[in-house]
């Protein structure tokens, strides 16, 4: 088949749908959009501002917004009873991970969908909006070097283990509901301090050059099992107890 010729099939992909999962599967979704006429994915309503922004360049992608995982499963169940363009020809899904296989969850996802894991990084793409990014930089009002810090009330960082002199910029819901608005702040930061979250995936996949930037993953703050922890390419310093 000619590489530019797409399979005339409408395929629904279903994987886990935290924002971190959506970022991990960016490359996977883009590979499928190259192969098939139409691709559909689910998206939890709270993540829609970021997910719709991330894929706004794709003309053959449908985003099925759901409010819960129960609604997602119900949509899949009734797919066979739909007609025309509302029906997917095929549903490809990974509903559970094999905790005992010793295989990292990200590798299980990409293996399940038949996409090389390297595409997580190599095919990752988001069309950035520099105007929105600059608006965030102006909004935080920090001039000079700073550190980008992302943690969670459930998984707080030890503030003694981050710079005591650099100003802190943190992504909050009040700042923006779109994680990609923070790309400019991220790439310019002198230091990055994060736990296992959507932001560590975004930072690791986002292609930018900042040779003096120091990256710190505060693993002690969120002891994610090794199989579930995001696979990383960039030169992170892992902070443990």
Predicted regions and their residues:
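Catalytic machinery of carbohydrate-active enzymes
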Residues: 1-241
């Amino acid at each position: 088949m000619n590489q530019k010729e797409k399979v005339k099939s409408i395929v629904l992909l279903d994987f886990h749908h935290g924002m971190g999962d959506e970022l991990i599967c960016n490359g996977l979704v883009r590979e499928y959009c190259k192969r098939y006429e139409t691709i559909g994915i689910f998206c939890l309503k709270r993540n829609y501002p970021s997910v719709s922004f991330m894929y706004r360049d794709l003309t053959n992608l449908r985003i099925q917004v759901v409010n819960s995982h129960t609604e997602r499963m119900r949509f899949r169940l009734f797919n066979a009873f739909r007609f025309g363009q509302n029906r997917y020809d095929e549903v490809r899904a990974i509903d559970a991970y094999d905790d005992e296989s010793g295989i990292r969850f990200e590798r299980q996802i990409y293996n399940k969908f038949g996409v090389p894991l390297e595409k997580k990084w190599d095919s990752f793409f988001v069309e950035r909006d520099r105007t929105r990014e600059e608006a965030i930089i102006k909004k935080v009002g920090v001039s000079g070097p700073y550190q980008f810090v992302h943690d969670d009330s459930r998984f707080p960082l030890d503030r003694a283990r981050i710079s005591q002199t650099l100003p802190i910029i943190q992504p909050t819901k009040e700042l923006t509901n779109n994680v990609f608005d923070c790309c400019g702040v991220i790439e310019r930061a002198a230091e990055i301090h994060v736990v296992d979250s959507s932001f560590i995936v975004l930072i690791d996949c986002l292609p930018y050059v900042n040779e003096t930037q120091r990256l710190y993953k505060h693993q002690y703050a969120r002891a994610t099992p090794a199989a579930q922890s995001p696979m990383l390419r960039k030169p992170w310093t892992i902070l443990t107890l």
